[in-house]
Amino acid sequence: MSIQSIVTKETLKKKDTNIEIQEKNMNDLVVSASRVIAPLWPISTFAAHHPWMGLEKQSFEQVANWLKEARNVDIYPSASMIHSAKAKGEIEESFLQIALSRWLDSQSFHMPRETAERFCQEALKLERLPSSLLSSPELNKLAEEISYVNTGSMKDSSMQPISSLIENQKGDNLSDILNYHIIKWCKLYLDDTGASWTMPNREKGFYRAWQHLITFDPALSKNERKVLKDWPEDPLIALTKALSELGISESNMQAYLEGHLLSLPGWAGMIRWRSQQSIEEQELLVEYLAVRLSMELAIVKPYLPLKNQKAEKKVSIVPLIASWIYWGDISVEKWSQMSATEQSELLAFAYRFDENTRKKLWLKAWEQTHAEQLREKIASKQRATNDKKRVVAQLAFCIDVRSEPFRRHLEKLGPFETFGIAGFFGLPIATTELGSNNSHPSLPVILKPKHQIKELTDENEYNSYEQRKKIDSSVSYTFKTMKQNVLTSMLLPEVSGPLLGLQMVTRSFVPRSVGGFIRNLRKTMLQKPNTTFSLNHVHDTNCEIPIGFTKEEKVNYVRQALKMVGLTEGFAPLVVMCGHSSQSTNNPYAAALECGACGGAAGGFNARVFATLCNLPEVREALSAEGINIPEDTIFAAAEHKTTVDELEWIYVPKLSETAQEAFDCIDSIMPNVSQHANRERLMQLPNFKTKIKNPSKEAHRFAEDWSEIRPEWGLARNASFIIGQRELTRDCDLEGRAFLHNYDWKQDESGDILASIIAGPGTVAQWINLQYYASTVAPHYYGSGNKTTQTVTAGLGVMQGNASDLLSGLPWQSVMQSDSETYHSPLRLLIVIQAPTKYIERLLNNDFTFREKVQNGWVRLASVDPEGRWKNW
């Protein structure tokens, strides 16, 4: 026996240490790789997120180029979108020329400037190079002749999964086969529908549950199962072993893991979200990658080692030469007569002025045009006047873009003042509605709840309500149980067919009547008794967070919200806190239409809690001591803005003072007219309507009740700006429902803390919403979720196309497209406009590194309006 084969305690200890170091490094690699995917919340909450939130340390341009190279995904607007926008006057040619001139100034080249400009001007027409030119023998012969030209800087450095490079004998790409298997195992493990038969050993974690079953999988060949039979039981060791046997070098491991995460970004995103929810599943992403790469090894092993696997991929010079022939008027003959240096410079210039660069300049021009049009709109409405009309009521709405038209019509038709604030009203709460055993974090998903608020009522009333709820839920519970049971599911069509058939016919042909009848019936049956809230602080050991608020917390949250919108004096007799909700039927994306600031739920609960706090005598006394005097006859109430039908539903109206009652009656009398105007404006934007609508409110209700309606409302489509300032800045401006509006008075914010909190909270949520719509528009096949009519809701988590696709993470086609060829949403990065002195913006950028990084790297745009009305782009 040789000395090398003797394993001593020392070598064992050293080996164990190496394994620990290796495992730690692998964990770090997975964490670093995970930045390329965004956490995906279940569709029941549909929290707004943008897919590049982990990549904001890179510039938007860098991420766009990387995605094009790594996944062939374009995240700039397409040529057709750009041409359409230009035809509609959304892009000024002058801004494109400015962008081009600046780009040329930033480049180093030795050719005449006129030659470069002429080439760029032609290339910016975004015409495709003719296929006849690209395939011409003369061009390809020329490319071979000048292949000696130095193109060292032009390399394709992307790292693709090995399975994507191999096809089996049937011509199927092995990555598609791998994805099929991974989707199957993810659905089994993540299923949240409470299926009768769940994945065995699920409680042991994804990897170990998979390992117990994989050797019995009939979809794998005998040899594939053999590879996995004696596979390591530890997911980290399995992942390390798979990478080693696949021949992935240590320097390429992170890029390789990123490639696998990007192969199914939806399922990987859901796995990542789950890993953040509990300690038990914090290693879930490691387990997912261990399963995926272990299966990849089993599938590709017969084909290993690959020829040219490590060969450096070079960029083809054929399209680069063709671009100069087509756009630069340089013929094949002229190319042949050039020196190698001249040829190399032309190739390098064409490589730099690629499709992404051209689209980047168009996007900048589009965004600059939008900013200029918004500046002109705001400037035209600014008035130097002090004659304020008498206000009988003040209404605070969510910053949601759908609030803007409603607020505009409300102010126009009555003596009202409106405010904009994030729809959770600054309350970091988890809400538990009456009769519910589950709480919902009713705040932006970037925050964690600090208080539990329960809805309460008298015991007798509660028992009666619970009994009615059980009767209502028994039918759906029975139906669900039968559907998920192996035997009863076969009887279900026979039992339920006649009733469901009748429902289908009536819902399809008379949706408004039937939907209204069912809704009113359930509303009557499930009418809540009068309820209160657990507002007072209680320490409950059974709850992770305390129930209710202390007196100091009550005062703090009210003070904070009132100061945030600048409402610290001049209170009207009636102040209404308006949450918002949506109303639609048969819509898996219902949560996407709810309040994003409330975690994908209706905002009425938060509005009611906040209004109740504002009416508490102890809160008012404490605020008065600080100089915020709320008059005794000023009453706070709560309502919910139904965005699908543009109605205001009262949800909390305490005893009103005489003046508050007058204001309440005034709102009620004017509201039908407001709804008609807001609905008419909104419905005319839908593709179904091109003529005048006789009864907009009636039509809006039909859309809400029709279960075949794929587009009950546009949601937040066309959002483009987030305006932080006093209402006077935008009052009477028709912002077309494209602006998030947040009240802010810089005079009450000497420290800048209020502005900083608006940017960190609502500003971030608005940016996520904006980039989610952006991504779903520019890359619907990758970041969208396809057509609603062909989707399948799966595992209680989200939607798929068919039964074996990625878990679709973005918005459906109907949320962003006007037609098959025309977009409705304009893919522009969010423009944040702040009304404040220049020094406030400078301080914000100096203190908030994260926000400064977003602005510098092109993830948001920033402008300001100073006290004199001067606009500045940052």
From Swiss-Prot:
Cofactor: Zn(2+)
Pfam family, any one: DabA
Topological relation to the membrane, as annotated: Peripheral membrane protein
Keywords: Cell membrane, Membrane, Metal-binding, Transport, Zinc
GO CC, alphabetical: plasma membrane
Keyword Lyase among UniProt keywords: no
A molecular-function term among this protein's GO annotations: zinc ion binding
Keyword Acyltransferase (UniProt): no
Entry binding sites for Zn(2+): 398, 400, 580, 595
Family assignment from sequence similarity: Belongs to the inorganic carbon transporter (TC 9.A.2) DabA family.
Quaternary structure and partners: Forms a complex with DabB.
Known function: Part of an energy-coupled inorganic carbon pump.
PANTHER family named among the record's database cross-references: INORGANIC CARBON TRANSPORTER SUBUNIT DABA-RELATED, UPF0753 PROTEIN AQ_863
Name the UniProt record assigns to this protein: Probable inorganic carbon transporter subunit DabA
Species of provenance: Bacillus cereus (strain ZK / E33L)
Taxonomic placement: Bacteria, Bacillati, Bacillota, Bacilli, Bacillales
